[in-house]
Structure formats: structure tokens, C-alpha cells
């Protein structure tokens, strides 16, 4: 039995798409368990670059089962647009290789409208949402007024729930935000058509995933975003609306914790963040710009420039602790090549006291000053390295120190964007 989690150990954008794609080679099933089409990752295979947002990365392989779990919020329009995009790239998506949970909640047009309107209303206190309707959909889920995929398969149930929701949503949209109301008939027609298209893909994914694990198949659970965007343990309120830590697999895919055998945290060799919120190691100078351009740090979904800084092992230690990580996969080592001195944050100075954890209060985190260790950099390109021994000596010293500081082994090192730019150091 083998069921393992792949998730982001920082603020997202760590290279999960590439690493999930690589690890999916040895998996039979790939499962998304939280988030929605607000996630964005790029996978490069030979001369093609695939940009995925919702469909699991295993779709790029033949004979893999890909699952959109119950913890995902599903925008059916976005899903079928991605299906068509993949077909245009030569990737077939069928009910045989993509299964959608009947319990997943649906993102509705009013969710997207409310997402954008509430963000605009916040003004300078905006969160930095992608505007995809993720948060409002999870809000309805928590309020128990959400509409699920299974409702689409029962048109009369869907119509009644849509009518009830629209009465409230239209009141908010028109009276609070001064926007035009949504038309019931238009949404009804559009979504019932989606229901017909979705029907062949819809199953009870919990039963399928459970049986696959029980029968000895390898199941990979693919996280979206990153540990510090977790709704409970991230840098709240600048977080996403779901549980992105390892434990989120259990409710998001409906399996028990004892079925998980390992968890791999994906981390860049430096740190990036999109949007607002404290960022202790952020570099607001030429070095930050250099890392951004060398690593092409711009969002797949939004195109926004990412904030860049030195590696923060306080963040990685927290990820290892709260997600039960058994190893790290380090990406973007190649981006640091050519830098004379490389720094790593080993702790924070908080009002004169050294701490090695992330305070819950953002006001306290903003007062934390990074305590650095400095390392000699490496001029050699690492792109041609295909084994750990072929890496530059200083790069290996850098990675070894990360293992010591986080008390977690590094199982994989990525030296470039393509599948073959991957070095397996140990078993995951």
C-alpha cells in the first residue's frame, strides 16, 4: 500500500506542478483534494509547456486515473475550458482518466462576482484573491447553502437550490455592491448543460480512491497553493480558503490518516510570495530583482510578479511539523547559480528574542527580523547535473545545511524546468 502527499511548503508557486508530474510517473492515481482553478502550475515536457489550473498533473500520462476530490471547489466552465486546452495540446481527457467527486461544491457565476466585488470593497485592505470565486464558494459550503456536483444530476433539486441562493445573492449584489442581478434562467440553462457534460465523469471518488489504495495501487495526492496559505495555519487573512497542509487530504479526499505513507514538501531554494502580508526575508533590492528574473517569478494564473527573498528555514520547519513531511523536494537550485554569497534564514529576532516559529499575529510577524547564515555561492551551471554527486560542492553544502536546520531529509533536487532536470537523492 502506498499513498503519498505532494504539497507546497512555502507560499505556493514552489514547483509542485513539475514535481507532481515527475512523481506521477510511478503513481497509478493522482488526486486533487482542495482548492480550485485558482491554482496554477506549469509542466514542461520536451518542447511543450502545459499550464494547468484544475485538472491533476497526472493527466499528461497515459493510463493514469486522475481524481478531482470532494474538497475541491469546481468551476465546470473552467474545467471544460481546460479539457479543450489539453485536447488542443494533444492530451485526451475522458471519463476513463478523469473522475470528478459527486460531493465537490460548484463555483457559480455569483461567486465570481462576489469575489471581485468584495475585494474591490476592501480597498487598501484587499487580500489579493485571484477573483475565481473560490472563497465565496467555500463560504457557502460552510454555511451549508452550497450547490454540489450531485445536485446537477438532479435538475429539480438544482433548480430549487439555485432559486434559494439567487434570492440572497442578488440582494447582496444589487443592494450592497450596486451591480446587476443575475438571471435565474440563464444560469439554470448554462449549468444544467454543464451537468449533462459532467455526468459521465462523476462518481463517488472516496470509494474509488480507498479501493485503489487497498488493492496496492500507488496514489499521489496533489496539493495546491502552499502551507503558509492554509486557512488555519497560514499567514491569515492573506491565505486561501481551504486546508493546504498535509492533514487537508483526509477531509478533501475522504480517506483516513492511517492510509498515508509519506508526505513530500516542495520548496524553492529561495522564497517567493504573491500578494500582501509580512515576508521576513523579502529582498527589495537588485538581488530580489535578479532572483525574480532568473527564476521567471510571475504567476501562472494571474501573471503577477512574485515577491522574492532568501530561503527561510523557519517556514520549512513549520511545514515539516504541521504537515508531517517525510522529505523535501528542493526546486530552482539553478536560479541561485552565479550568486557570490547565498543567505539562509535560520531564525527570527523578535523584539530582541530569538524565535524559530511563525507568530500567529501578522503584527508580530512584521516585527520579526531574519537571522541569516551566509554561504559561498556556486558559479557552475547545475542544469546538466543528473546525480547528486555532479552538483557543485557549495550547492551540496547548501542543501546539507537545509536538511540539518529543518531536521528533514531532501529526497529530490530539481535543477531545471523539465522532467529530466530532476535528481533523486533518496526514496520519498
From Swiss-Prot:
Give the SMART domains listed for this entry. Answer: Adenylsucc_synt
UniProt pathway = Purine metabolism; AMP biosynthesis via de novo pathway; AMP from IMP: step 1/2
- Give binding positions for Mg(2+): 13, 40
Q: Name one GO cellular component term.
A: cytoplasm
Query: Where does it localize?
Result: Cytoplasm
Q: Which GO terms describe its biological process?
A: 'de novo' AMP biosynthetic process; IMP metabolic process
Binding positions for IMP per the UniProt entry: 13-16, 38-41, 130, 144, 225, 240, 304
User: What catalytic activity is recorded?
Assistant: IMP + L-aspartate + GTP = N(6)-(1,2-dicarboxyethyl)-AMP + GDP + phosphate + 2 H(+)
Write one Gene Ontology MF term.
adenylosuccinate synthase activity
UniProt binding sites for substrate: 300-306
Q: Does the keyword Cell cycle apply?
A: no
- This protein's UniProt keywords: Cytoplasm, GTP-binding, Ligase, Magnesium, Metal-binding, Nucleotide-binding, Purine biosynthesis
Cofactor comment: Binds 1 Mg(2+) ion per subunit.
Protein residues bound to GTP: 12-18, 40-42, 306, 332-334, 414-416
Reported function: Plays an important role in the de novo pathway of purine nucleotide biosynthesis. Catalyzes the first committed step in the biosynthesis of AMP from IMP.
Q: So what family is this one in?
A: Belongs to the adenylosuccinate synthetase family.
Binding partners and assembly: Homodimer.
Q: What is this protein called?
A: Adenylosuccinate synthetase
User: Gene for this protein?
Assistant: purA
